[in-house]
Design a protein with these regions (language model features):
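Secondary-structure boundary elements
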Residues: 185-187, 215-223, 259-269
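Short regulatory "switch" loops immediately downstream of catalytic or recognition motifs
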Residues: 169-178, 216-218, 256-263
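Metal-dependent nuclease catalytic regions and adjoining charged, substrate-binding loops involved
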Residues: 93-96, 100-102, 106, 113, ...
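Hydrophobic/aromatic-lined pockets within catalytic cores
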Residues: 61-66, 215, 230-233, 259-263
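Metal-dependent nuclease catalytic cores that hydrolyze phosphodiester bonds in DNA/RNA
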Residues: 1-208
Length: 345
């Protein structure tokens, strides 16, 4: 049974329930998880250029009608780059930290700029940076992100949108991806874009998910989940994205979520999830990365790659349940059980 398909993305994200994103965050930074999901404190995320491009491509490809609800078109053609972008983002961060709930700012711009200059990495003096900043597109961009980020919008430029449209066109015409992204509703296929499901359980823990694309094939009697990723390195997706961002957690939860959400289709097979990976610069061809029996087993049980251990969903959920039950976030389950004594072998 499909649940939550009509909620807006904002309403979906407001649902207090773990997801693959929060589970990944717990596994990599439990302090941030504790602040965001237990204490309900606001944690600002720094968007990379690739992640913004990914959301743009996803929206233009699957939900173009929602563009204005997710993005704000900047009046500048090009956003600041390199150290100036770092300076602008640092300005925003320190401005936000100095702003109370009524919108009053407790620090002067000069004080905020001094801290932003330190964070940005600029080697030139602050006066020289401000000479480049004041009256420039960078200042306009700074004012825009201050205005719209509080509304849940992402600032993008016309160049960003043009590039995203090029990527969408590539996905629609590439031999590997076109048969997937161009699928439309028919007697044979049911297509669900940005499918929201909630309330499914894995190892007794309740989750929600928003799946980019789910295709139900009534002829083959299969259910296929797709997730779109936009990265700087399509060919090296496995190491530079899948492992780094622990996307195997997402793949496993999506698989389990799809099985439970479509349980009424008793004679249908839920296939392992696939990642559609496109190049955020639109140079390399998109590739499709498929989960296998081995990778799904690794996703659940954990695995080692090049000497580094990656915890599986089973362990991560067990650790999270322990932390919640004991309200203990400053030590791992294993080290607590060992009375904070760690043996070095």
């Amino acid at each position: 049974m499909i649940q939550g398909t009509t909620k807006t993305e904002a309403h979906y994200r407001a649902i207090i329930m773990d997801s693959s994103s929060s589970l990944k965050e717990f596994s990599t930074n439990r302090r941030k998880y504790h602040k965001r999901y237990i204490l309900n404190e606001k944690v600002e995320e720094e968007d990379s250029k690739a992640s913004v491009m990914g959301r743009l491509v996803e929206t233009l490809l699957m939900e173009e009608h929602l563009f204005d609800k997710k993005f704000h078109m900047s009046i500048v053609t090009n956003a600041p780059t390199a150290l100036m972008l770092d300076f602008v983002e640092a300005l925003y961060k320190h401005t936000l930290a100095a702003t109370d709930e009524n919108g009053a700012i407790s620090r002067t711009f000069e004080e905020i700029a001094i801290d932003a200059h330190k964070d940005s990495g600029f080697k030139i003096k602050l006066d020289a940076v401000l000479a480049k900043f004041i009256g420039s597109d960078a200042e306009v961009y700074y004012k825009e992100i201050r205005e719209v980020r509080s509304k849940g919008l992402t600032v993008v430029t016309t160049d960003d949108v043009t590039q995203a449209n090029r990527i969408v066109e590539t996905l629609k015409t590439n031999d590997a991806t076109a048969p997937i992204v161009n699928l439309v509703e028919s007697d044979r296929f049911n297509i669900h874009n940005q499918l929201q499901i909630e309330g499914y359980t894995v190892l007794g823990h309740t989750f929600k998910s928003m799946m980019d694309k789910v295709v139900i094939d009534h002829k083959e009697k299969t259910i296929q989940v797709y997730d779109l990723k936009c990265t700087w390195s399509v060919e090296n997706f496995y190491e530079e994205y899948y492992l780094y961002r622990r996307s195997y957690i997402q793949a496993y939860l999506y698989f389990e979520g799809a099985k439970q959400s479509f349980a009424d289709l008793t004679d249908y097979t839920v296939l392992y999830p696939k990642f559609i990976v496109c190049d955020s610069t639109n140079y390399m061809r998109p590739l499709i990365y498929e989960m296998t029996d081995t990778s799904m087993d690794h996703a659940f049980s954990g695995f080692t790659h090049r000497g580094r251990e990656y915890p599986g969903v089973k362990k991560i959920i067990k650790d999270l349940q322990w932390a919640i039950k004991n309200d203990t976030w400053d030590v791992s389950r294993e080290n607590s059980i060992a009375n904070s004594v760690v043996k070095i072998n």
